Amino acid sequence: MKLDLVKRTFNYAVVNKPSGMVCDASHTNNIITALTNEFTKILPSVNSSQFRLVQRLDRFVTGGLVVARNKKWADKVRKSFFQEGTLRLTRRYVGLIALDQIPESTQGTIDFPIQALEKDYRGKNKSRELFTYSAVTHYKLIPSARRTIKGVFPVFQQGPILPIILELETGRKNQIRDHIIQKFGVPLLNDDNFSDFKLNSEIPKDVNSKLYKSNQIALHSGLVIMENNGISQQFLFPVNNAYDRELW
């Protein structure tokens, strides 16, 4: 499983993550180890301790994210999530949902509150507290790209598949996955068990393998726009892994 290094600077790295890689250094097959391996091919002296996760993608979600290389830049990214400082990050995703009918309104804002367990998997044997968070997601459905897919897996037999573009205003845990269900009454493609496992203390090994050959979810971080001190950079991320492209 390969992590694509899109850009590297003294302050940050931009990467394209495959499905199955974890954004948590305490787990095996994690993004920090993979990023360190890529860097050491160019800079052998690089140590994994310099990398700081300021964005996270769920294990079975693909696409781009920014990783800070020092505390100053990490703080800068975190401030941007609260509209503070000089840095602005725009994060856009593309997802797939199965909808029999196209809603009258094909774009808008989802602002339902979401519930999530406290962010600490190290205490698996201890019940974690449940919190309610405010959350805001902007969306746009693409009716012209709606298709009925003839695939061998049950995940393609749930109805016509409709692409949706999503932009985060807040960055809560599982925000997009939660908001899709609340807004449309259906999950993202191959995310049918989300409502069951999101409040479990342990991370499940198998999420939706009965519907598809892997646990990959039809959600991809496709675009990151970074604006810093008047300079704007856009990073467009394809689904690079051929194995991951089959769901799309």
Curated annotation (Swiss-Prot):
Family label: Belongs to the pseudouridine synthase RluA family.
Gene3D superfamilies associated with the record: Pseudouridine synthase (3.30.2350.10)
Localization: Mitochondrion
Gene: PUS5
Protein name as catalogued: 21S rRNA pseudouridine(2819) synthase
Disulphide bridges: none
Span of the signal peptide: none
EC number: 5.4.99.43
